[in-house]
Amino acid sequence: NWPVILPLGVLEYHGEHLAVGMDTLAVTRVLDRLEREADIVILPPFYYGASSHAVAGPVGNGTVDVPADRLLPFAQSLFASLLKIGFRNVHGFIHHQTENFAAGMPTDLAFKLAARQAIFAFLEQERGEGWWGDEKMADYYAKQAESADPFNWIQVHPLLNAAAIKQFPFDHAGEGETSLMLELCPEGVDMGRFSAKQWFTRTAKQASAATGRRGVD
């Protein structure tokens, strides 16, 4: 029952010095390293999340924004297919907007809801209506405590959890994300194009691969 990993991300403007795929590249590069140490299946990455145009408009900046309500049916169909294959240990990882992961942001919320809906539909199809109320499920809460809950078959996680974020300069295209890219994907960084015109990029000059390594570790 190897873990099946789905890298989730967006294409979003990250200043002039970082690749627009930064949020996704951070996830895929971390998973590349994890794959050397653990038995996992990595699915092709999904780049087209709900980036929004909060940072910058799309013209000349490369941001691609797919609304969450469009992501939901796609994600539900994808998860349904993975369940039909037989996977029961599916994990999505996302970096975009995860400083608000506990409350949720459009992309991760869409995939979380899709996971629940896909599991509900799968269980009802496989076990019939009333499956949870059946006498066979009398030990549901005991099994849930033992991590046998079917709603754990698909989970979505932040690349950096809350504890890691407290220890790392989490930001958008500043020291933190630029450092992550210097460590994980240096070809996606061009400090020769750096501009301090935007407030969110100004700390990028302080970035280093060593700081990025601390975030990855």
Where are these regions (language model features)?
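Extended, histidine- and acidic-residue-enriched regions that form the cofactor-binding/catalytic faces
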Residues: 1-217
